[in-house]
Design a protein with these regions (language model features):
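N-terminal membrane-targeting hydrophobic helices
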Residues: 1-195
């Protein structure tokens, strides 16, 4: 799945749960956790230069249950630093401040789990149980990146950015999740017919 979808899905779930105890910082923590493990692209050079260290590639070490948690913790810590969130706030003209605490890390890990589930549904597979196993798991329901899903997720992010009433934002989030599940259902149906 794409970067935008990995942010929108946990953010949407946490928003649509409509729990009073979840504020915008909590929902942002989930969304940031959803994208945190894709910053493994920074490790790409290691896996490219030293093929024996292939686990240091995109969809490598950070796409496991254990290292996903570690990555989420580091990511939430970094973006909770005033210099980092100050720069981001300045660039996008929105307050995206999150706090580094166990609640934020737990919600970020929820984002990681949604990310792992979405990537499990795509082609290529992910090493969920690394370092205990190098086996890559996949359901091959979605393509690695689906252009329609990417475009719709980006449109939802634009809607979230605009100063619209919360009910319209919730409608966009719900519609996106319905679309994502529907596409998955259609593809599962196609796979079953092919068997």
């Amino acid at each position: 799945m794409d970067f935008f979808t990995h942010f929108v899905v946990p953010f949407a779930i946490l928003t649509l749960l409509n729990l009073r105890s979840l504020d915008i910082k909590d929902r942002l923590s989930g969304g940031f956790g959803g994208i945190s493990i894709d910053f493994d692209v920074i490790l790409f050079a290691i896996g490219f230069l030293v093929p024996e260290l292939f686990i240091f590639t995109h969809r490598g070490i950070t796409h496991s249950f254990i290292f996903g948690l570690i990555t989420a913790m580091v990511f939430i810590y970094l973006i909770s630093r005033p210099s980092i969130y100050g720069l981001i706030n300045y660039m996008i003209k929105r307050d995206i401040r999150v706090e580094f605490n166990w609640r934020a890390v737990s919600l970020a890990y929820f984002g990681v789990l949604t990310h792992l589930f979405l990537d499990f549904l795509t082609t290529g597979g992910i090493p969920l149980f690394y370092p205990f196993s190098l086996t890559r798991f996949t359901a091959t329901i979605y393509y690695y990146t689906d252009p329609v899903t990417t475009i719709v997720a980006l449109a939802v992010l634009v809607i979230l950015y605009l100063r619209l009433k919360p009910k319209y934002k919730k409608i966009a989030l719900a519609a996106f999740l319905i679309m994502l599940v529907s596409f998955g259902g259609i593809r599962v149906g196609d796979k079953m017919e092919a068997l």
